[in-house]
Amino acid sequence: MPEGHTIHRLAARHAELFAGDKVHAASPQGRFADGAARLSGTVLDGTEAYGKHLLHHYAGELTLHVHLGLYGKVTDGPGEPPPPVGQIRLRLTSDGSRSRRGGRRAELESSDDRHWLDLRGPTACELLTPPEVAALRDRLGPDPLRADADPERAYARIRRSTTPLAALLLDQTVVAGTGLIFVVEALFRAGLPPLLPGRKLTPAGWAELWADLVALMTVAVERGRIDTVRDVHLPEAMGRAPRVDRHGGEVYVYRRPGVPCHVCGTEVSRGALAGRNLYWCATCQAG
């Protein structure tokens, strides 16, 4: 499942391509036909990401809510869209009516100002009213990538809980946007065992952990991949081979079970928590 940085990148991309334009919406698959009909002809006012949720805000207080889930995928391109292939839940095309405003928009390599977007396989694709958008935000924890995030709201949950810290950080009602990679890597960098009960995390420990999540996720937005390894542990600094993994990026423990820790040489451990794999270093994260 895409982690929060991916959704923030999509929100920025869609604003760049479509904000200020009227859009034509269609559902080639048919499952979002009514919603697409309501969107067609409206102007996209702006976009935002909240955790793993993507929101398009249209004129007339229409909000498109998308959650990609495990299988969702978004593609886009310039000009006329290609013939529909596969199960396209939603296709958006812009009419190119907005004037060029310079900046990154002017850098787009396109023969005209029109663009298209295809959404396939999302867990959620729906229109929300303003109260429903507010309810969605209210049920999510703070998002480390948002300026309005209140980390103390998350810590209020964590410090009262006996639930393992890794499980709390994966709970989107506690912290929004964090997935397994960010969680296991941030815990490693903080030297915290993933099974540490939440109530044992000190205020200072939480402040450090939150700040590191903000930093790691911000870098991931900028680079388009998750890199968590400090400079001293990069391949060129250690004289080791780069990581080869479909997720890309350099990490400490994620999907590295049985191989030496970059810091201490202990074999990275793997365990399970609520049906999900966990990765940690028993030496560096002794607690």
Q: What do these predicted regions represent?
A:
Residues 1-287:
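Structured catalytic/nucleic-acid-binding cores of DNA maintenance enzymes
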